[in-house]
Amino acid sequence: MKARIILIICLITGIAAHLSANEKIYINREVTTHIVMPENIKMVDISTTKIIGNQCTDNIVRIKPYLENDSISSEGYKENELLGTLTIIGERHIAQYDILYTESPKYASTIYNVSYNETQSYI
């Protein structure tokens, strides 16, 4: 009986961890990252003040790490530091991403195309 309870708890924990895991997008202060949704965007939520951005067209959002002064060195954020969560709500789907900082501009996404596999339908 104890073994069954432990097994059930492990399964529930594993499922919960899988469901809460977001895709990751890496950004850098020298690169503007454009996120392209496969449908028109209704709303964008940036969960923190460490990321700035705007919706530049019906289906594209652009983001960058926020630095109070451009003269601040990259030491302001650490490699792989989680800056926040980005939620994009489209006409029928929602996508959520963990935004991480990378010190190397070559590892930052310049254009990130959202696939329907990365979204959830809310209708």
Question: For each of these PLM feature ranges, what is it?
Answer:
Residues 19-123:
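A general "mature secreted/periplasmic domain" signal
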Residues 4-14:
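Sec-dependent N-terminal signal peptides
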Residues 1:
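Glycine- and charge-rich intrinsically disordered segments
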